[in-house]
């Protein structure tokens, strides 16, 4: 089993001088803000891969989850995808989706998403002929109600 000191730093590289180091905006912030390295224009209903020009080495016990920033979500901007595997070493890109009605401009240095480190578990998978039954069964997609 891999043992890692919880205080071990996560190494990252600025691939260009346009890259900005990930930052936490408060001591209690769950995520590190990621910054756009370039200018982009995203029309309504479209999506764009935003480059950060940052690459990093994830701890073996974690993966990186790219999550939306609440201020951008309020403007109709969402995240597509959002998993950085622990063995990925390339430029971290963020897929922004413009669900709003207006064109959205991303400027160099804008905070575009947050990176949250989450522990990961790699279970052994076992194929079986059937699963144990539960009261819920195969009912999903809102079947438990709103309240």
Swiss-Prot record:
Keyword field: Early protein, Hydrolase, Magnesium, Metal-binding, Nucleotide metabolism
NCBIfam families, A to Z: dut, PRK00601.1
Matches recorded under InterPro entries: dUTPase (IPR008181), dUTPase-like (IPR029054), dUTPase-like_sf (IPR036157), dUTPase_trimeric (IPR033704)
Induction pattern: Expressed in the early phase of the viral replicative cycle.
One Gene Ontology term of the molecular function aspect: magnesium ion binding
CDD domains attached to this UniProt entry: trimeric_dUTPase
GO process terms (BP): dUMP biosynthetic process; dUTP catabolic process
Name of the gene: OPG046
Organism: Vaccinia virus (strain Copenhagen)
Cofactor(s) annotated in UniProt: Mg(2+)
PANTHER family: DEOXYURIDINE 5'-TRIPHOSPHATE NUCLEOTIDOHYDROLASE
Signal peptide: none
Catalytic function, reaction form: dUTP + H2O = dUMP + diphosphate + H(+)
Coiled coil: none
Protein name per UniProt: Deoxyuridine 5'-triphosphate nucleotidohydrolase
Role of this protein: This enzyme is involved in nucleotide metabolism: it produces dUMP, the immediate precursor of thymidine nucleotides and it decreases the intracellular concentration of dUTP so that uracil cannot be incorporated into DNA.
Uppermost EC category: hydrolase
Residues binding Mg(2+): 24
EC number: 3.6.1.23
Ligand binding (dUTP): 68-70, 82-85, 88, 93, 95, 111
Alphabetized Pfam families for the sequence: dUTPase
Family stated for the protein in its record: Belongs to the dUTPase family.
């Amino acid at each position: 089993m891999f043992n890692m000191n919880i205080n071990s730093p996560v190494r990252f590289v600025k691939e260009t001088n346009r890259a900005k180091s990930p930052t936490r905006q408060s001591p209690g912030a769950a995520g590190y803000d990621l910054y756009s390295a370039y200018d982009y224009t995203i029309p309504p209903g479209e999506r764009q891969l935003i480059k950060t020009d940052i690459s990093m080495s994830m701890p073996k016990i974690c993966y990186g989850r790219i999550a939306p920033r609440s201020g951008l979500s309020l403007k109709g901007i969402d995240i597509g995808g959002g998993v950085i595997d622990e063995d990925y070493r390339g430029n971290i890109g963020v897929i922004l989706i413009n669900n709003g009605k207006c064109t959205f401009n991303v400027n160099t240095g804008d905070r575009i998403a947050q990176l949250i480190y989450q522990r990961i578990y790699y279970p052994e998978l076992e194929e079986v002929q059937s699963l144990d039954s539960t009261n819920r069964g195969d009912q999903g997609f809102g079947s438990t109600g709103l309240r």
